[in-house]
Amino acid sequence: MEPLPPLLLELCEAVLDQGGRAFLVGGWVRDLEMRRQQGLAGFPAAGEFDLEVYGLPADRLATLLGRFGEVKLVGQSFAVYKLVPRHAAGSGAAPAVDVSLPRRDTKVAPGHRGFEVQGDPSLSQQDATRRRDFTVNAMMFDPLEGKTIDLWGGRDDLSARLLRAVDPSTFIEDSLRVLRAVQFSARLDFAVEPATVELCRGIDLSDLPAERIWGEIEKLLLKAGRPSIGLDWASRLGVVDKLFPELKMLQGCPQEPEWHPEGDVWVHTLLAVDQAKREIDGLPIEKALTVMLAVICHDFGKPSTTALVDGRIRSYEHEEAGVLPARAFLDRMNIRTLHGYDVREQVVQLVAHHLTPSHYFKNRDNVGDGAFRRLARRLEPDLLYRVSRADCLGRTGDFSTEAQEWFIGRVRDLSVQSRPPAPILMGRHLLEMGLPPGPAIGRITRAIYELQLDGRIRNLEEARREARRLLNEDEVNTS
């Protein structure tokens, strides 16, 4: 049971003493009501709280907040403050609190960003909550009275597991809400209410910036237990048609029933992305997203390569054919690097090599250690293993992952899970041997490294010996 932080209650009491009222809003209230409907006691955990304050002008609110910790102004025109409590780094410290005035939105231009937003402490609760996206996100909680205020039927929609627009006239003004419907449908495992479906399908999405599209897709991939639910709703709500032609091409693309009894490439991709979610445990966010994106993109080459050959459905060389559409898909969301990790290039390489574990296994008697070490120069074999498992298990029927387990076993034996071996011979070693600076240093170190990858060079002594032999050959050839 998670109690409300004492500081939060003290803050609400201080607002009340000044003649105002403070209410918790947003996802925390939704999660609280979901817990209550499930018969769970206590409050949901929160890394951060969203507090909306009525009846106090911005200057008085800022002064009051300063008594409780460091106050940062996040949005000046609509008075949003981030309160970082004193001693926030200590044990049991209260989480940060985003504090805002009720907002009055005025549509002044087309598109997602075409709003003029002003904080208005005199706004009624009904008018303030009217601007929210879905009824389940429009509830408020009074921490002092312990009561939830539900003006739009959010509790009923929670019970029915529905996402319903609060106000159709304001809902359609913000195109991002269509993508929020996509990610919330998967995170909550809710259906979208039919009238809201029609609203979403009629909204133009061309104004959405790449970073906002990615922001919602990232939440879908990381926070949903079954991301396929969101991808399915993305198709139903028109998002796939409008934003992701690479996904649209998967729909109706046939596959050989012997290997894919589940159906077309779209159905396989939905199953595979849910399996991928089970494969990313323990990975940092950037690598988890890399695996999820690679699985979404892994069969992008099938629509252009699928053909009927001798009575069977084939898609020869679809791995390489998927590279260009994968790049286009990633570019549409401006996916590049995350935390210094090149997500884009790693995803592309995983798409291009997603069948490699199976190919290596089929030819295991002829695949040497060098093949694994060289593969690790292009991508992370551990991530490839996870992508390949998701591909294999993202089907109906009983399919073995023997190839994938053999592959990762070899990878671990060679210690190339995330990178190739470090070169044994460096340029400084050749300089120590008396070789002058010049292009010969790069040529010889590269040649020695290739031998190292094949296992023919195992230590520095062998590397130096081979370097001397190559130098002697050069002298003979140039004399």
Regions found by a protein language model. Give the residues of each.
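Catalytic cores of the polymerase beta-like nucleotidyltransferase superfamily
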Residues: M1-S479
